[in-house]
Amino acid sequence: MVNLKCPICGGEITVEDDALPGELVEHECGAQLEVVKQNGKLSLRLAEQIGEDWGE
């Protein structure tokens, strides 16, 4: 298990060691976060909110 910090509220989040980049986790503050790997280390960033595309 790896302890990471929420980029929104600074709270601690425990993520599995085998978490993959792109995996989504939700923090108790309500933020939807994406696991990213930079320089061999896991970190979190705010997940992009993709809306529905109706072809307009």
From Swiss-Prot:
Q: Motif span (EDWGE)?
A: 50
Q: From which residue to which do the TFIIB-type zinc fingers run?
A: 1-34
Listed GO molecular functions?
Answer: zinc ion binding
PTM characteristics: Formation of an isopeptide bond between the gamma-carboxyl group of the C-terminal glutamate and the amino group of alpha-aminoadipate (AAA) is catalyzed by LysX. The bound AAA is then converted to L-lysine in a series of reactions catalyzed by LysZ, LysY and LysJ. Release of the product L-lysine is catalyzed by LysK. Formation of an isopeptide bond between the gamma-carboxyl group of the C-terminal glutamate and the amino group of L-glutamate is catalyzed by ArgX. The bound substrate is then sequentially converted to ornithine which is eventually converted to L-arginine.
The coiled-coil regions, if any, are: none
Q: Does the keyword Magnesium apply?
A: no
* Modified residues annotated as 5-glutamyl N2-lysine in this record: E56
Q: Name one Pfam family in it.
A: Zn_ribbon_LysW
Q: Which InterPro entries match?
A: LysW (IPR005906)
Q: Which residues carry this modification: 5-glutamyl glutamate?
A: E56
What are the protein's UniProt keywords?
Amino-acid biosynthesis, Arginine biosynthesis, Isopeptide bond, Lysine biosynthesis, Metal-binding, Zinc, Zinc-finger
Residues recorded as bearing 5-glutamyl N2-ornithine in the entry? E56
| Entry-annotated residues carrying 5-glutamyl 2-aminoadipic acid | E56
Q: Name one GO biological process term.
A: lysine biosynthetic process via aminoadipic acid
Q: In which pathway does it act?
A: Amino-acid biosynthesis; L-lysine biosynthesis via AAA pathway; Amino-acid biosynthesis; L-arginine biosynthesis
Where, in this chain's numbering, is Zn(2+) bound? C6, C9, H27, C29
Q: Which NCBIfam families match?
A: carrier_LysW_Arch
Functional summary from the UniProt entry: Carrier protein that bears the covalently bound substrates for arginine and lysine biosynthesis; bound L-glutamate is sequentially converted to L-ornithine, while bound alpha-aminoadipate (AAA) is sequentially converted to L-lysine.
| Subunit annotation | Monomer.
Q: What is this protein called?
A: Alpha-aminoadipate/glutamate carrier protein LysW
